[in-house]
Amino acid sequence: MSKLRSYKKIGGDYRYGDESVARFINAVMLDGKKAVATKIVYDAFSIISERNNGEDALEIYRKAISNIAPVVEVRSKRVGGATYQIPMEVKPSRRSALAFRWLKIYAGKRGGKSMAEKLAAELMDAANDQGASVKKRDEVHRMAEANKAFAHFRF
């Protein structure tokens, strides 16, 4: 029997003590520049709380992540010379990783001055079930729904 891989524990971030925020900072980070990524995320959180009359930015962030995270996705499997898109349930760790990735990508594609402003705008849109990252989640769910007939091929 194979032994399960043990993952390195990530402590919470230093402002909120939240592991999810620490993982999000790591997802935003480019070229190992963690201080820059931390500043971007915390600036985005301060912009969110300013625009929402002092409402807790962490709650808006959590709501946005839960709105973006996909429940099902399609995976390719080759069966008898044909490749099928098989709908599969997404593990919780992958759900959050996909949410972080989509949030970063679609915030970067937005127009705006700084990455912090773009990230804040995308987070607020996602919390309200709008924005490009929520569209991406809906698109993934539609693909899974369209290929429901191949669910019996699960691996």
Curated annotation (Swiss-Prot):
Q: Which GO terms describe its biological process?
A: translation
* Molecular function in Gene Ontology: rRNA binding; structural constituent of ribosome; tRNA binding
Q: Which domain of life is it from?
A: Bacteria
Cellular component annotations (GO), alphabetically ordered: small ribosomal subunit
**Statement: the UniProt record of this protein carries the keyword ATP-binding:** no
Instruction: Please report which protein family the annotation says this sequence is part of.
Output: Belongs to the universal ribosomal protein uS7 family.
Subunit organization: Part of the 30S ribosomal subunit. Contacts proteins S9 and S11.
Q: Which NCBIfam families match?
A: rpsG_bact
Q: What does this protein do?
A: One of the primary rRNA binding proteins, it binds directly to 16S rRNA where it nucleates assembly of the head domain of the 30S subunit. Is located at the subunit interface close to the decoding center, probably blocks exit of the E-site tRNA.
Would you tell me the protein name for this molecule? Small ribosomal subunit protein uS7
Could you tell me which species this protein originates from? Answer: Chlorobium chlorochromatii (strain CaD3)
UniProt lineage:
Bacteria, Pseudomonadati, Chlorobiota, Chlorobiia, Chlorobiales
